Amino acid sequence: MLKLFSAFRKNKIWDFNGGIHPPEMKTQSNGTPLRQVPLAQRFVIPLKQHIGAEGELCVSVGDKVLRGQPLTRGRGKMLPVHAPTSGTVTAIAPHSTAHPSALAELSVIIDADGEDCWIPRDGWADYRSRRREELIERIHQFGVAGLGGAGFPTGVKLQGGGDKIETLIINAAECEPYITADDRLMQDCAAQVVEGIRILAHILQPREILIGIEDNKPQAISMLRAVLADSHDISLRVIPTKYPSGGAKQLTYILTGKQVPHGGRSSDIGVLMQNVGTAYAVKRAVIDGEPITERVVTLTGEAIARPGNVWARLGTPVRHLLNDAGFCPSADQMVIMGGPLMGFTLPWLDVPVVKITNCLLAPSANELGEPQEEQSCIRCSACADACPADLLPQQLYWFSKGQQHDKATTHNIADCIECGACAWVCPSNIPLVQYFRQEKAEIAAIRQEEKRAAEAKARFEARQARLEREKAARLERHKSAAVQPAAKDKDAIAAALARVKEKQAQATQPIVIKAGERPDNSAIIAAREARKAQARAKQAELQQTNDAATVADPRKTAVEAAIARAKARKLEQQQANAEPEEQVDPRKAAVEAAIARAKARKLEQQQANAEPEEQVDPRKAAVEAAIARAKARKLEQQQSNAEPEEQVDPRKAAVEAAIARAKARKLEQQQANAEPEEQVDPRKAAVEAAIARAKARKLEQQQTNAEPEEQVDPRKAAVAAAIARAQAKKAAQQKVVNED
């Protein structure tokens, strides 16, 4: 009794909510064995026949290929595709593929040569001696994908399972009403299917292996039991017929009682599922060394004269398969790829067979009935009762129509398996699955855009962070460069520090003077002499700078001399007219005059030794001197007529007169030494001299006629007479020079 209860608990199955029981139409095609189809003349092989990116092309137009030769390279999740037969690559171009919209995808077009030659095949009959990674890589490189309809790369799926898989489930339910591809494969190739299951078990090392099959396949069940008669590691579970019990989540719950978490995978609960056709493809890839180049396809429907299951080469046009089965199309004939509930209508028949093509249904007009017009939802909740995923299809329908993507996501539209049970029971004939597919596509597009925006933002923030780091590093370098002295500065600083240390050492070192000896002060004396020499050099340099600065323009010097003479005459007149407030000591005046003459001679010598910066034009100098004299006489006349406001110191006047005479002599020497650039007209010079003498006589008469207000000092008069005689001599010399 205990063994009976243990066996009952061991073989227990669970039931999922919802589901439907559509009419069974499997008997149309499951009664005849698998057969081969004649080769087509042209094959179209899309590069992408699986979930993921397409592989990298490794053939070119014009290449000769053999059956099983790779057309692309598979890296990562990129699954390679292989040539279905031998022939020549005639084109690599976009071509319409198995898609509801017949989207064009890049494809390799091969013209068959009819020989159907294989590449050299290397089978691994002793696969148990191979490492797990080697087997997974071989399965991946031989292009094996999920043949149940999803098309997920099998190698990637096995790699992702890892060591956490406890239960391996082989899906043999095949719940669609018309499809019998897996049923017929198990009837004809049960041993090969079981061998493929053992290879998968060797890779995953699960605790249990379960085969789930519906009870509407008695012949397949009997064949599997016969193969598994002597095996105790694989358990065959027969489950009730109910649509969609072949769904991955539904079959997992039926066999294990475990539910796949929302948004998760079956591997999260220790379960991995593979299709019957996938197990057979794994066997051929590992043991026989044959890449996947063909699969079993069900040809059924009342519009086909010879329904059944055939070995269809990948890339074979649908039209070729249907014509071989006796296709008799009507006026409005439709062809469905897949089952009537989860399949889609083909826009035309030139699309190729791919890895996920399991059925081609060509129903008659009476078989599917007249198309019904879509009506408004009546909120009957029949769709919610039939949903195997426990969703609310009527709410998802409203959210999909209203573009309310957030609410649709909140109501778990991603969990919809698109089984079509809701649309099957809908009394309003609403194509709910179409709305859900469109809504999921829009949500996927929105998420893709958000992902791109997030990546762009991350790149921008990374760039900003990089720029900030570079800026901070640049500022740090500048600070370091400013703080750290240059090499020369370092040397100077080091030398200064060395001198300071040496002086400190010398200062702290005691001086010992022995009896009878004199201290050695030679170093101190040498340092003192060096400082004196340095000071003298600086003083000489400063003196040279000052001497260079004192060398002025001769023309400016002539003007200044004329102005000085005018001031001297003005001062003499003021002193002659003014009464001295006090008597002047003759000795002091003589001393001051001698000092003034000495300063004047010194100034003349410095200017005579200095080289003039540029040659002076004698005519310009003479004109400027005449203008200066005229201005001086005019100023003298104005000042002689005006009453002096204050008394002038006679000593200061004598000094200024001596300085003026010195400047006048300097100007005469410069003009005498300067070489005239061009000859001066003697007549003009004589005229100017006559005019000057006339003006001088006129001025003397005016001064003679004027009544002196006060007595004139005899000494001042003598000085003025001497100045006048000097000016007369100068004028005479200038006249002689001009005449020569």
Curated annotation (Swiss-Prot):
It is found in: Cell inner membrane. Residues 602-716 are annotated as: Disordered. The complex is composed of six subunits: RsxA, RsxB, RsxC, RsxD, RsxE and RsxG. Keywords: 4Fe-4S, Cell inner membrane, Cell membrane, Electron transport, Iron, Iron-sulfur, Membrane, Metal-binding, Repeat, Translocase, Transport. [4Fe-4S] cluster 1 binds at C377, C380, C383, C426. This is Ion-translocating oxidoreductase complex subunit C. One of its GO terms (biological process) is electron transport chain. It comes from Escherichia coli (strain SE11). Belongs to the 4Fe4S bacterial-type ferredoxin family. RnfC subfamily. Its cofactor is [4Fe-4S] cluster. Its EC number is 7.-.-.-. Its main location: membrane. Pfam families: Complex1_51K, Fer4_7, RnfC_N, SLBB. The keyword Ion transport does not apply. InterPro entries: 4Fe4S_Fe-S-bd, 4Fe4S_Fe_S_CS, Ion_transpt_RnfC/RsxC, Nuo51_FMN-bd, Nuo51_FMN-bd_sf, RnfC_N, Soluble_ligand-bd. GO terms for molecular function: 4 iron, 4 sulfur cluster binding; electron transfer activity; metal ion binding.
